[in-house]
Amino acid sequence: MKTLSPAVITLLWRQDAAEFYFSRLSHLPWAMLLHSGYADHPYSRFDIVVAEPICTLTTFGKETVVSESEKRTTTTDDPLQVLQQVLDRADIRPTHNEDLPFQGGALGLFGYDLGRRFESLPEIAEQDIVLPDMAVGIYDWALIVDHQRHTVSLLSHNDVNARRAWLESQQFSPQEDFTLTSDWQSNMTREQYGEKFRQVQEYLHSGDCYQVNLAQRFHATYSGDEWQAFLQLNQANRAPFSAFLRLEQGAILSLSPERFILCDNSEIQTRPIKGTLPRLPDPQEDSKQAVKLANSAKDRAENLMIVDLMRNDIGRVAVAGSVKVPELFVVEPFPAVHHLVSTITAQLPEQLHASDLLRAAFPGGSITGAPKVRAMEIIDELEPQRRNAWCGSIGYLSFCGNMDTSITIRTLTAINGQIFCSAGGGIVADSQEEAEYQETFDKVNRILKQLEK
């Protein structure tokens, strides 16, 4: 195994370096950007730009296609096992570097429906978006923008100077402005949402489940460049786990406030969000809103259920006795909403990989409910369409062993002139129908309205 670290050269610092370079790459299939959203947030340190992967993995249903130069292999093996084998085959294991969290490796999308490969679920919801369940590139280079140290680092396991020349030779080609060509429409009426809410309540009161995340999906048609839409949304939403992925079939625009799982030098962290109230224009009223959320018995109960679920999921692979909860019920403000967040930490054993951790906890419990598998069965029964990219994860598994992933909430899927955006909320036994319905709008109204401008 090569322990050589990648060659690194430092480029001129500019705060918008990630967008500056990615704007020239944004049209290339498999060009991907992880962006910290300029957020005033402790986890808004790094932006990561990649393109031109040396290998790609795409999973549709039971089949994963691995494409490496001219060679294409199709397998029905566990997709995360296949991914780990591809990473192992690269035979690169650089030493940990806290200033370079991603030193090449796997980066991309793990859609919600990838969970069907790890749990047995019904197939009731319509599959109407033809994007892969997993779309991951293996990259031997990356551009890392560090907003803490004010550095722009280009790293490569091949000729770093050739990569720099390639990057600087890319031409910015003006694209058509992004425009919605229809109004947003939901996939369910208010009455239909009410019926589904009451069905969830029946399941809860019969003891089938104790929390279910129920969502509605909004849809519009559009023309123009999706990257232009992302630039506009990213500036306005300042979400620490934002991302733009250009896939062969379409684009993913993510403005996520939520970390799924970080594994940094075998230290595990997950930060589930459960509990939401809208921000208010008046600062004093807004402060009261934050206090109200912090003291909400319902939201604390919801949050605690997911903390317990995530402790259990991570505990399946963590070092025995290492799972801890250093933060419980912390209110974090974002531009549109206040969120109630908790933090769980643990240690990954030496013999396991980050991919084992991802599999053990996927998809994140904060967007399913609890118990997880039963909640996912109910979701498949009640939501008209499959979730696809929404409520999955975007992130990386670095050659050095690190992993960082988001939960893809506040995330739009753009494909064939159609754009989709979903929002849901955790329903528990004492949830109020109107409040839950309104919460779905509180979460995405800001995004939907920005694209209408």
Curated annotation (Swiss-Prot):
TM regions (residue ranges): none
Effect after changing R316H: Catalytically inactive for both the glutamine-dependent and ammonia-dependent reactions and fails to interact with PabA
Native source organism of the sequence: Escherichia coli (strain K12)
Keyword ATP-binding found: no
Modulation of this protein's activity: Inhibited by 6-diazo-5-oxo-L-norleucine (DON). The inhibition is competitive with glutamine but uncompetitive with chorismate. Also inhibited by 2-fluorochorismate.
InterPro entries noted in UniProt: ADC_synth_comp_1, ADC_synthase, Anth_synth_I-like, Anth_synth_I_N, Chorismate_C
Effect of G275S: Catalytically inactive for both the glutamine-dependent and ammonia-dependent reactions and fails to interact with PabA
Keyword presence, Magnesium: yes
Residues bound to L-tryptophan: S36, Y43, S44, R45, F46, P240, F241, S242
GO molecular function list: 4-amino-4-deoxychorismate synthase activity; magnesium ion binding; protein heterodimerization activity; tryptophan binding
Functional pathway: Cofactor biosynthesis; tetrahydrofolate biosynthesis; 4-aminobenzoate from chorismate: step 1/2
Mutation effect (E258A): The reaction is extremely slow
SUPFAM superfamilies: ADC synthase
Pfam families, sorted: Anth_synt_I_N, Chorismate_bind
Miscellaneous remark of the record: In this enzymatic reaction the C4 hydroxy group of chorismate is replaced by addition of a nucleophile at the C2 position. The nucleophile is the epsilon-amino group of lysine 274 transiently binds to C2 of chorismate. PabB contains a tryptophan (Trp) molecule deeply embedded in a binding pocket. Trp which cannot be dissociated without denaturation of PabB, may play a structural role in the enzyme since it has no effect on the enzymic synthesis of aminodeoxychorismate.
Catalytic machinery residues: E258 (proton donor), K274 (n6-(4-deoxychorismate)-lysine intermediate)
Catalytic activity reported: chorismate + L-glutamine = 4-amino-4-deoxychorismate + L-glutamate
Descriptive protein name: Aminodeoxychorismate synthase component 1
Recorded superkingdom: Bacteria
Outcome of mutating K274R: Reduced catalytic efficiency
Cofactor: Mg(2+)
Enzyme Commission code: 2.6.1.85
UniProt xrefs under Gene3D superfamilies: Anthranilate synthase
Disruption of the gene: reported phenotype: Cells lacking this gene do not produce 4-aminobenzoate.
GO biological process, one term: 4-aminobenzoate biosynthetic process
